[in-house]
């Protein structure tokens, strides 16, 4: 047996006898460290003659590979044994209580959207949706809003820059972030045969920001298209909706003449409130004051015509209100900006249980 064979046997023996990782590391440093015996042999190859290097080189490299592989195998065996020992000594007490998991809550806007869908579903309305990036035709022109209307101004509407090489105005005009959910009504009238009953909740965008306005807000609009529709149907629908939403039968509505380009006649709708300890409470047969909550009216014949329907055959009414404002009135929030701040304290206070699904039988705000 040569000296290299003896060295190999000695190192393999030390490796196999290592009882822990620290001892194995000592063997590795002794053999393969910078000053290790195997490392010294590898360095000596540079001083040998070509004949000696050809003879002893393969043997020395084989020695190094055997030692390195032995160390790796022994390390894995020691780590496995250590893990098994740890698992055997550690037990799980299944009777201990589990860590408390934080619970999320439903945002008030989501809750109100669910309440609106439940109320109007009971009245035969479907929920419709549409793109938030719209063109001028669907957002303005089809709704009888002329080019000169201030709503089309840059300071009130978020317009997109035209793509490179594209015309500033295509067939449908410039692209923009919708300023209301009315384009959903247009798309529904274009793509669906009447009669139509829909609500269109969703995000809308206007260049405005203060305690009661944000650049992005939520709106719901309703549309009915049928034969023989008149203002009495609109008034009954609004009264039924408001009383169901605020869960009070003593709510009084006041309809005031107004102007909207897309309805004729148009009306602002106020809800009566009573004062209790300085607070405004929605409801009461003898209101102490009035608060505006939504706009409404009979769909303008020009809008019906723009959607390919005959206004002499089909009539309709529409209404719209801010979902965020409805939430503020019902649940007592004071600042609209808090809806979008992401303050966990605010969300915990005003949030709703995720499984608390609104129903008319159980009370939509229960």
Curated annotation (Swiss-Prot):
Per the UniProt entry, the Enzyme Commission number(s) are 6.1.1.20
Name the positions where Mg(2+) binds. 264
- Leader sequence segment: none
Q: Does the keyword Repeat apply?
A: no
**Keywords from the UniProt entry:** Aminoacyl-tRNA synthetase, ATP-binding, Cytoplasm, Ligase, Magnesium, Metal-binding, Nucleotide-binding, Protein biosynthesis
Cellular compartment(s): Cytoplasm
Tell me which PROSITE patterns the record gives. AA_TRNA_LIGASE_II (PS50862)
Organism (species): Zymomonas mobilis subsp. mobilis (strain ATCC 31821 / ZM4 / CP4)
Tell me the cofactors it needs. Mg(2+)
Q: What is this protein called?
A: Phenylalanine--tRNA ligase alpha subunit
Q: How does it assemble?
A: Tetramer of two alpha and two beta subunits.
Q: Which gene encodes it?
A: pheS
The record's Gene Ontology biological-process terms are: phenylalanyl-tRNA aminoacylation
Upper classification of the organism: Bacteria, Pseudomonadati, Pseudomonadota, Alphaproteobacteria, Sphingomonadales
């Amino acid at each position: 047996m040569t000296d290299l064979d003896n060295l190999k046997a000695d190192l393999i023996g030390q490796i196999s006898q290592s009882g822990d990782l620290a001892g194995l590391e000592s063997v590795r440093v002794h053999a393969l460290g910078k000053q290790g015996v195997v490392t010294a042999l590898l360095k000596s190859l540079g001083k040998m003659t070509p004949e000696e290097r050809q003879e002893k080189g393969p043997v020395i490299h084989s020695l190094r590979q055997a030692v390195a592989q032995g160390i790796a195998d022994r390390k894995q065996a020691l780590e496995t044994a250590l893990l098994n020992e740890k698992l055997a000594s550690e037990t799980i007490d299944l009777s201990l209580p589990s860590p408390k998991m934080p619970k999320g809550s439903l945002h008030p806007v989501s809750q109100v959207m669910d309440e609106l869908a439940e109320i109007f579903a009971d009245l035969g309305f479907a929920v419709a949706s549409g793109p938030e990036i719209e063109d001028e035709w669907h957002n303005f022109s089809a709704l009888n809003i002329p080019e000169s209307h201030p709503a089309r101004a840059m300071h009130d509407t978020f317009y997109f820059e035209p793509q490179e090489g594209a015309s500033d105005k295509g067939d449908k005009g410039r692209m923009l972030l919708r300023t209301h959910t009315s384009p959903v009504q247009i798309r529904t009238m274009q793509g669906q045969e009447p009669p139509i009953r829909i609500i269109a909740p969703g995000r809308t965008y206007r260049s405005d920001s203060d305690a009661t306005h944000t650049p992005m807000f939520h709106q719901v609009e309703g549309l009915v298209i049928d034969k023989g529709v008149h203002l009495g149907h609109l008034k009954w629908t609004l009264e039924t909706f408001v009383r169901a939403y605020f869960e009070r039968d003593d709510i009084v509505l006041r309809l005031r003449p107004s102007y909207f380009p897309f309805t004729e006649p148009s009306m602002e709708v106020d809800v009566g409130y009573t004062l209790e300890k300085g607070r405004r409470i929605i409801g009461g047969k003898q209101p102490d004051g009035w608060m505006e909550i939504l706009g409404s009216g009979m769909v303008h014949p020009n809008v019906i015509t723009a959607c390919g329907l005959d206004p002499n055959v089909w009539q309709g009414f529409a209404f719209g209100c801010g979902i965020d404002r409805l939430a503020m009135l019902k649940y007592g929030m004071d600042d609209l900006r808090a809806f979008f701040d992401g303050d966990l304290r605010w969300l915990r206070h005003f949030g709703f249980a995720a499984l608390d699904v609104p129903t008319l039988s159980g009370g939509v705000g229960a």
